[in-house]
């Protein structure tokens, strides 16, 4: 049930009937204050200016033509022409009952599209670090939401599995394999990479062999390919453990590394030349883009092949977009990559559009995000200034959560304590990120994210268990609830309206890739439930009918919180 869409359509029809153009926008919004109703339509002023009418007069005409019988109990006009809509409690109650009887909480599936979502993208032979957190968990929340709405979502883990560094890595893997130390060395990818780099820098013979392996690997040599595949497999097996800990839906089958596009690159360069988009410049192959200017004010030159024949990341990204449209049949392509890569993507996509590889009808969207900062406002690092490994961050989250939970539940058995620490600790790390606008930098703060107060995972998880516990205390099975939902108290009505706004929050996340909108919705819902719980006795209601009604509101709240948190990739438990 999308109230916003319903009201927008109704008000637009009335606007058109009042003389507004067919493409006018009603600008319906959820009201910030109860005195202005449940929804406001703010589009009258702009349309009145177009029509040369006093806004108040147009608003009166629209309200006179507006048919909200059975939907709104009152419609009034405020100020110069704001239309305030107060929803009818009986209408709300009917839709709450429908949501309660629906496995999807009354949310309809949409017309399915094939949507490719590019996220996570770690590098082979390197451990995942905190810099991978935002792409991985924001991208996964987007994927979960789009899938829930009925889209065919293709997860694309654009792993860095190609490049000149692989000659060095293969040469070192060969060296340690000969010494029987391969498994031990590969157990710490970071150490393996550093040792390989040290050998490359200090041993000329090793470096020469490494450079030779680069050429052989790129030429398809089977031995080098076999060694390369081992490096990829070991890395992704370790990454999969991290994804599982994070409750992220990526699997090995979702890996679409840079190497996937290698065979396309010569054809891309030849095609761009044939179309007159790429030219030779100082031995390199370059695309000059009028849409972007360099420091001298001249068209920006984008190198797609160096004079030594090597291809660049841009060439791979052009091929990648082409593949996603032509082979994967994408209707929409979304990239969760940090904001520093924005110009790089814009250059690649401009070439993609000019070459006709992806039509304008297929959106290419960069859902960029800011950096993770420490409390000092600087990029989040170890005290020594090094990069924090993701496994170490998650280990600390679990230990902090274990101490927190143990302090609140001294008698809890070890197994339940470990499970609860996992849910709370991982949930805290994820929710702290997801609850902030992805376009801004955010400060990583253990104390805030593990607090049981405010918009945090522990608060939200506790809110769910609190609602769920009501049923245990009621002694009544969920399936045995009977009777109509009655909305008499103000707190009941406010909770009812918010419950029915879940679809609006989900639709926003699906459109804009902004999970913080869903977090804000769920937090607001939890706060409204607290007010309802405080002012409207549930188990000790005045009569049986009211008790049944309020239990139904509690049940729908629990299901909504659980579904919303699940879409964010946050687990819930029945007891905390």
UniProtKB/Swiss-Prot annotation:
GO terms for biological process: arginyl-tRNA aminoacylation. Its EC number is 6.1.1.19. SMART domains: Arg_tRNA_synt_N, DALR_1. The keyword Nucleotidyltransferase does not apply. GO terms for molecular function: arginine-tRNA ligase activity; ATP binding. A motif ('HIGH' region) lies at residues 122-132. It catalyses: tRNA(Arg) + L-arginine + ATP = L-arginyl-tRNA(Arg) + AMP + diphosphate. Its main location: cytoplasm. It comes from the Bacteria. Transmembrane segments: none annotated. The keyword Ligase applies. It is found in: Cytoplasm. Keywords: Aminoacyl-tRNA synthetase, ATP-binding, Cytoplasm, Ligase, Nucleotide-binding, Protein biosynthesis. Belongs to the class-I aminoacyl-tRNA synthetase family. HAMAP family: Arg_tRNA_synth. This is Arginine--tRNA ligase. It comes from Sodalis glossinidius (strain morsitans). The lineage of its organism: Bacteria, Pseudomonadati, Pseudomonadota, Gammaproteobacteria, Enterobacterales. The gene is argS.
């Amino acid at each position: 049930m999308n109230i916003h869409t319903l009201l927008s359509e109704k008000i637009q029809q009335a606007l058109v009937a009042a003389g507004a153009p067919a493409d006018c926008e009603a600008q319906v919004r959820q009201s910030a204050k109860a005195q202005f109703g449940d929804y406001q339509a703010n589009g009258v002023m702009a349309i009145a200016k177009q029509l040369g009418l006093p806004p108040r007069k147009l608003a009166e005409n629209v309200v006179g033509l507006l048919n909200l019988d059975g939907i709104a109990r009152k419609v009034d006009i405020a100020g110069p022409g704001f239309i305030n809509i107060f929803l009818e409690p009986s209408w709300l109650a009917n839709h709450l009952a429908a949501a309660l009887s629906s496995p999807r909480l009354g949310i309809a599936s949409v017309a399915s599209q094939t949507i490719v979502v590019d996220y996570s993208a770690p590098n082979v032979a390197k451990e995942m670090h905190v810099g991978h957190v935002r792409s991985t968990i924001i991208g996964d929340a987007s994927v979960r939401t789009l899938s829930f709405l009925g889209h065919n979502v293709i997860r694309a883990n654009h792993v860095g599995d190609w490049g000149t560094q692989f000659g060095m890595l293969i040469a070192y893997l060969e060296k340690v394999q000969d010494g029987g130390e391969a498994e031990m060395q590969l157990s710490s990818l970071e150490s393996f990479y550093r040792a390989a780099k040290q050998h490359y820098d200090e041993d000329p013979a090793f470096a020469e062999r490494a450079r030779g392996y680069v050429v052989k690997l790129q030429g398809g040599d089977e031995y080098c390919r076999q060694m390369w595949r081992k490096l990829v497999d070991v890395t992704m097996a370790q990454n999969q453990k991290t994804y599982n800990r994070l409750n992220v839906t990526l699997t090995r089958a979702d890996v679409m590394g840079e190497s996937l596009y290698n065979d396309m690159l010569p054809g891309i360069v030849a095609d761009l030349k044939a179309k007159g988009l790429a030219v030779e410049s100082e031995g390199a192959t370059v695309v000059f883009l009028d849409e972007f200017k360099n420091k001298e004010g001249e068209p920006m030159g984008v190198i797609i092949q160096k004079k030594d024949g090597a291809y660049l990341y841009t060439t791979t990204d052009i091929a990648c977009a082409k593949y996603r449209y032509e082979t994967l049949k994408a209707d929409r392509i979304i990239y969760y990559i940090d904001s520093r890569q924005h110009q790089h993507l814009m250059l690649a996509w401009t070439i993609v559009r000019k070459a006709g590889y992806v039509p304008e009808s297929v959106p290419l969207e960069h859902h960029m995000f800011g950096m993770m900062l420490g409390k000092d406002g600087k990029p989040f690092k170890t005290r020594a200034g090094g990069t924090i490994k993701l496994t170490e961050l998650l280990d600390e989250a679990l230990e902090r959560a274990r101490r927190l939970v143990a302090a609140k539940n001294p008698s809890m058995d070890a197994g339940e304590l470990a499970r609860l620490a996992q849910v709370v600790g991982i949930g805290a790390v994820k929710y702290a990120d997801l609850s902030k606008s992805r376009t801004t930098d955010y400060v990583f703060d253990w104390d805030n994210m593990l607090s049981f107060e405010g918009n945090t995972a522990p608060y939200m998880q506790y809110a769910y268990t609190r609602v769920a516990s009501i049923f245990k205390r009621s002694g009544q099975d969920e399936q045995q609830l009977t009777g109509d939902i009655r909305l008499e108290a103000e707190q009941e009505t406010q909770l009812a309206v918010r419950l029915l706004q879940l679809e609006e929050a989900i639709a926003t996340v699906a459109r804009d890739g902004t999970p913080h909108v869903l977090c804000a919705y769920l937090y607001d819902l939890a706060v409204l439930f607290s007010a309802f719980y405080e002012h409207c006795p549930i188990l000790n209601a005045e009569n049986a009918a009211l008790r049944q009604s309020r239990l139904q509101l509690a049940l729908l709240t629990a299901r909504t919180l659980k579904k919303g948190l699940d879409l964010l990739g946050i687990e819930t438990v029945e007891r905390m």
